[in-house]
């Protein structure tokens, strides 16, 4: 039915789960993660309590192995369940019930577990592990590579439908809205993995752009512009990033360069021009900067 990976990143301490299934809206069912605690994947005739209870057990001090044993020993239908857990120490444990539909199995690695059931081939979970361990990238991209490797081996016997990815911080801050670093989901799609890959790329772009906010607040406009330009290079199709970069460049004194980007955004959607003036009303842009931008935009229009 499903293939997934749970993992802890040694360098950052982040925990993650990524999954793909021929099942509508897999995201609320399979991936569970809590900052500073660990991650759980529960699948194959899903017992949703494995997710929340598994995290509670980890939070109470259980190891991954102890938590998994507690879950399965109290489940009269453990033979149809598949579950994997990674704890705060990076220890992993997995269970593939004897009545999971074949091909079904799992493999454990250093800080991760790959598991699958109802696969076309029994090579899926090993291929996932190999892709995860040989990809040099952040945790999310390594998990993405694992999912793509599973699909390359034939994936779910029934086909493809939904996918999801969750990454949380290695240390909890008590602020869940900050601790949940990545939370992406493709609920129903003909090609869920390419769409998940696209969403991850856009998420990275906006995370990079987000770093520019702090730099701008501290007066480092050059640093902010560099971050925004990097974000734009990751997702050049995102009009908002083009507009944001252009405005920041104009504020920093490069009105000509900034106006080029703003003009490109306006050509895509003319309402971005109105946005310039609305930003002035809430003190996010100075009126003189907008006047200078408008002068450049008028000059560009005359040349066109």
Language-model features: locations:
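Canonical positions in the second alpha-helix
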Residues: 231, 264-265
